[in-house]
């Protein structure tokens, strides 16, 4: 998804009723992605920690909580590595687009439970307290103080990152990339999109088959699931 976004493309059409992956430009992005593995020899299933600590893989892409893994499992290279923005795409004006696909985590209230107990307002107040900058910052600092480097906690907001226990050398980078993050739209049926793209990728790389054909034949599964879910919720579909 990062490669799609860096090239200015969107995963779904304007009203989120179908995927745009059937467009030639987006298919070429998928093809370029798979060719890192089929043509340039990258491995798609490796033990990143082991390969990184030995120098076999000098550069890897992951979420910032991977700092924990390296700090604990590879102490012998402590201070010899750092983090940076994801590799970007050069634009026509010479600038580099570092847009990175972001994962979404949520907190929620089970309404049927709290309404039954008459605790709706209290549940909402708790959720606001838990996700507040002060609570998240304090929790991350106290957790790290109690359990050490392994307890680095992915806090719920930017202010908590700024005030939390993340090392300054990492904090500066993490804060600088926040404006580059772009989340995948969460639409009815979208859970199948990532799964389908991943399956097409694995098939292409494992069987060394044509990436565009492999992706194309899977698109009906995405659009059909989106249509079915939108019909289930009484929403308009791409066919209307």
Outline where the language-model segments fall.
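Extracytoplasmic/periplasmic substrate-recognition and gating elements
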Residues: 31, 35-41, 74-147
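C-terminal capping/gating helix-and-loop segments adjacent to ligand/active sites or protein-protein/ligand interfaces
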Residues: 102, 168-222, 227
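A ligand-binding cleft/hinge motif common to bilobed small-molecule-binding domains
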Residues: 64-78
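Short helices/loops that flank or line small-molecule/ion binding pockets
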Residues: 46-60, 199, 203-207
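Periplasmic solute-binding protein
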Residues: 1-16, 96-112, 193-202
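Short, low-complexity disordered leader/linker segments with a strong preference
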Residues: 223-240
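Glycine-centered hinge/linker elements that transmit conformational signals in sensory
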Residues: 15-45
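Paired acidic/hydrophobic, glycine-rich loop segments that form the ligand-binding mouth/hinge
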Residues: 58-63, 82-84
């Amino acid at each position: 998804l990062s490669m799609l976004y860096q090239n200015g493309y969107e995963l779904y059409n304007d009203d989120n009723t179908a995927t745009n992956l059937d467009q030639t430009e987006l298919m070429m992005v998928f093809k370029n992605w798979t060719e890192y593995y089929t043509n340039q020899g990258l491995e798609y299933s490796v033990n990143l920690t082991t390969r990184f600590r030995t120098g076999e893989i000098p550069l890897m892409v992951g979420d910032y909580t991977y700092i924990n893994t390296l700090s604990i499992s590879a102490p012998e290279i402590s201070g010899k590595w750092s983090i940076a923005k994801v590799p970007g795409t050069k634009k026509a004006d010479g600038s580099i687009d570092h847009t990175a696909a972001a994962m979404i985590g949520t907190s929620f209230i089970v309404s049927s439970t709290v309404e039954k107990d008459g605790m709706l307002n209290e549940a909402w107040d708790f959720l606001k307290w838990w996700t507040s900058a002060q609570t998240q910052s304090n929790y991350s600092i106290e957790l790290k103080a109690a359990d050490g480097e392994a307890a680095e906690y992915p806090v719920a907001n930017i202010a908590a990152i700024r005030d939390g226990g993340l090392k300054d050398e990492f904090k500066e980078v993490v804060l600088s990339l926040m404006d580059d993050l772009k989340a995948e739209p969460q639409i009815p049926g979208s859970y199948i999109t990532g799964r389908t793209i991943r399956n097409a990728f694995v098939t292409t790389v494992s069987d060394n088959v044509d990436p565009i054909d492999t992706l194309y034949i899977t698109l009906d599964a995405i659009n059909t699931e989106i249509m079915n879910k939108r019909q289930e919720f009484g929403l308009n579909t791409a066919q209307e």
